[in-house]
Structure formats: C-alpha cells, structure tokens
C-alpha cells in the first residue's frame, strides 16, 4: 500500500471513530441526519430521500439523495466520511437494476416508485444475529 493510500485509510478510520455507516445501495430510502451550525447554535437536521447514486472514491466517497419537497425534486450530495454527518438510517430497501438512478429525475408520481426489496426470513434472522 503506498503512502497516500495509508494516509487516506487513517483519515477514514479517524472520521468513522464512534459512528457506523450502514450498508446501503442505490434505490434505498435513507434518513441522513446532518449537523447544522447556525451562528452559535448547533442542531441536527434530518434529510430523507432515495439514494440515486453512490460514488466510492476512498476518502472522497459521496452519495446523492433525492427527495420531493413541495412538488419540486431536490437532490443533495453528502460526503460519506464528513464530520457533519451525524448518522445514516436505512428506512427501506429498494429493488433496482441500476447503479445510477438518474432516470428518476425525469419521472414523477407512480412512475418514480421503486419496488421494495423483500428479504427472506432465514436471511433476516442471520443478519440480526451478526
């Protein structure tokens, strides 16, 4: 492993200290809690939407979450290892056949729905034991 890769790995471990990032994939509905600083106040803001893209680039990894707010589509890009991310919660697993769901930008209503990925009972039991 070269020097830059080692430094990036150390920074990733430092960023993950005390928090866990769940496994999520494009199509999943997630709730991203973000630390927001307004003046001297600090609060946590929740952003819920569908993950439409994940970009794995080591320390520079990010993901895009899309939601519909007041009838308008809003997309927000989050840095995976950012200290501003308080937590990520996977609310619902989506069953999609693409890695990038940019086609959802042109769709609205029923055509923008994503099927839910149903896991079998024995797989769910095995996952809960780990």
From Swiss-Prot:
<comment type="function">
    <text>This protein is located at the 30S-50S ribosomal subunit interface and may play a role in the structure and function of the aminoacyl-tRNA binding site.</text>
</comment>
<dbReference type="InterPro" id="IPR001857">
    <property type="entry name" value="Ribosomal_bL19"/>
</dbReference>
<keyword id="KW-0687">Ribonucleoprotein</keyword>
<dbReference type="GO" id="GO:0022625">
    <property type="term" value="C:cytosolic large ribosomal subunit"/>
</dbReference>
<dbReference type="InterPro" id="IPR018257">
    <property type="entry name" value="Ribosomal_bL19_CS"/>
</dbReference>
<dbReference type="InterPro" id="IPR038657">
    <property type="entry name" value="Ribosomal_bL19_sf"/>
</dbReference>
<keyword id="KW-0689">Ribosomal protein</keyword>
<dbReference type="GO" id="GO:0006412">
    <property type="term" value="P:translation"/>
</dbReference>
<dbReference type="Pfam" id="PF01245">
    <property type="entry name" value="Ribosomal_L19"/>
</dbReference>
<comment type="similarity">
    <text>Belongs to the bacterial ribosomal protein bL19 family.</text>
</comment>
<dbReference type="GO" id="GO:0003735">
    <property type="term" value="F:structural constituent of ribosome"/>
</dbReference>
<dbReference type="InterPro" id="IPR008991">
    <property type="entry name" value="Translation_prot_SH3-like_sf"/>
</dbReference>
<protein>
    <recommendedName>
        <fullName>Large ribosomal subunit protein bL19</fullName>
    </recommendedName>
</protein>
């Amino acid at each position: 492993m070269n020097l830059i890769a080692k430094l990036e790995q150390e920074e990733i471990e430092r960023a993950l200290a005390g928090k866990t990032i769940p496994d999520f994939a494009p199509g999943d509905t997630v709730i991203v809690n973000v630390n927001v600083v307004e003046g001297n106040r600090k609060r946590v803001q929740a952003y819920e939407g569908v993950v439409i893209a994940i970009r794995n680039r080591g320390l520079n990894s990010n993901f895009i979450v899309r939601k519909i707010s007041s009838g308008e589509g809003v997309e927000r890009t989050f840095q995976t290892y950012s200290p501003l991310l308080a937590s990520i919660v996977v609310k619902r697993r989506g069953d999609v056949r693409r890695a990038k769901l940019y086609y959802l930008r042109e769709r609205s209503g029923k055509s923008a729905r994503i099927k839910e990925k149903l896991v079998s009972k024995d797989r769910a039991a095995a996952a809960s034991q780990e």
